[in-house]
Amino acid sequence: MLVLDSGAVSRLAERSRASAALVLALRDEGLWPAVVPSVVLVECLQGHAGRDATANQLLKTCDVVDQIPVGLARRAALLRRRARRGSAVDAIVVAIAEPGGTVLTTDPDDLEALAAYSQRVVIERI
């Protein structure tokens, strides 16, 4: 499973050849559509249709997870406590990638700290 954080959504939504090539490569590897927890949208959208247009186009190709079950929220809280860093959104991103998933990000520091306490989650920088 491939999970995107807000930085990855923003980067992949850029109108660049590199971003388009990466999405195509992920699709070819069977890793697309990516999973995006809905709480990530709070960090990568601005609430303006024009400014959010490219991100919204990308999100239409992803599996956006609307509901965060209580068990997943508790797991994210445990990851935050153990790592002693990271936002609630970052912790949910890592928890949803368990077990054995990959998180794509532009800022791996807090995510790597959380993943150190996860079940085999890998953090990849784009």
Language model features with spans:
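Alpha-helix capping/helix-boundary segments
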Residues: 8-9, 40, 72, 92-93, ...
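Short glycine/proline-enriched coil/turn segments at helix->beta-strand junctions
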Residues: 49-53, 81-84, 97-102
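Phosphate- and divalent-cation-binding pockets in alpha/beta enzyme and binding domains
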Residues: 43-44, 75, 113-114
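Short, well-structured N-terminal submotif of metal-dependent ribonuclease cores
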Residues: 1-35, 45-63, 124-126
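Acidic, PIN/NYN-like endoribonuclease modules and their adjacent C-terminal/linker elements
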Residues: 98-126
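Acidic catalytic patch
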Residues: 61-82
